[in-house]
Amino acid sequence: MSASQTSDVPTLLVKIFGKDRPGITAGLFDTLAAYSVDVVDIEQVVTRGRIVLCALVTEPPRGLEGDLRATVHSWAESLKLQAEIISGIGDNRPRGFGRSLVTVLGHPLTAEATAAIAARITESGSNIDRIFRLAKYPVTAVEFAVSGVETEPLRTALATEAAALGVDIAVVAAGLHRRAQRLVVMDVDSTLIQDEVIELFAAHAGCEDEVAEVTAAAMRGELDFEQSLHARVALLAGLDASVVDKVRAEVRLTPGARTLIRTLKRLGYQVGVVSGGFTQVTDALQEQLGLDFAQANTLEIVDGRLTGRVTGEIVDRAGKARLLRRFAAAAGVPLSQTVAIGDGANDLDMLNAAGLGVAFNAKPVVREAAHTAVNVPFLDTVLYLLGITREEVEAADTLADDLGDGPGRP
């Protein structure tokens, strides 16, 4: 074991800050190299053109520390930078148990909200080890790496702050399992798309109000989903089957849906949808978006008209969870490596069964029960909960465009 790997070795923390320019990092370590020091740790960040570079190194041989300090300060001054050198022992203290990642989404993210979140993390007994910006638009997304408290109580402590401050806060356990998630399954109506498909059909049948009333009650969990499904579909009896193509054309993807799916597919994820809506729409979405899995209810059509009935397996609350398990088995992925996204009460079993359940612009009962919630109108913000940065997404799009295989961004 080298001296730099022991906890009691004398070290120097060298901090450089000022206007960023090429060559600062190389210049600092070239200066330090003359004193035979070992590098213990390095951190560097550039914010609005200003650099903060911290290097933790072992002390130089006896009698040379004063010369090292003078040389570093002289080098920094020559570049109009500031330098600070602090003596100490060893490296950072070991991170505490209960390592978690706290992702905060704000539109905007205010100083007041940031202060309240940091204070609640501290009050819970956690320590903030690192802060990193994941995205600056369409929302500001910031990730806090914290330690000292188990994930579940920290999530509970921050849930109240999220509601009061008007931000979204996701808390997940840190570790390799986060990088291992390989299957994402989402609801369709009001999640993948902005619409409720049954209401699009109802508009053509002239029964929007009746269908909307039943839909709202079902999504709040006040009605049995299967009963409400049959009641709503019955109102469509006699509708000409040509309406199916019209409804497909009316469907509007949620902003960020293409970006989410495109990015996940590039990373090797499999992506599926489950819907209490209809295969007449989800099959088209599967082909359009390149989805690996899709399952929904099927409207019965006889002699060119809707009969007012559905056929086959009913996709309800329990059915969505069952399909998540089925898709995971087909993909060879354990449930712990799945992500589920939904907005309604009939998504709850699926959200709870997944390794990470995300309530997307959901009803209060769903937000409270899910692992985490997102309340901004951009579906690709789910990527930030997986630790994927906006910069990485855009770089991948640019590379695809340069190679001539860009998918056509929304």
Swiss-Prot record:
Which region is the signal sequence? none
Where do the TM regions start and end?
none
Q: Which reaction does it catalyse?
A: O-phospho-L-serine + H2O = L-serine + phosphate; O-phospho-D-serine + H2O = D-serine + phosphate
Positions binding Mg(2+) in this chain are D187, D189, D343
* Any one GO CC term of the record: cytoplasm
**Gene3D superfamilies in UniProt:** 3.30.70.260, HAD superfamily/HAD-like
Keyword terms: Amino-acid biosynthesis, Hydrolase, Magnesium, Metal-binding, Serine biosynthesis
- Cofactor entry: Mg(2+)
| Group of enzyme by EC | hydrolase
Q: Where is the active site?
A: D187, D189
Record's family?
Belongs to the HAD-like hydrolase superfamily. SerB family.
Know the name of this protein? Phosphoserine phosphatase
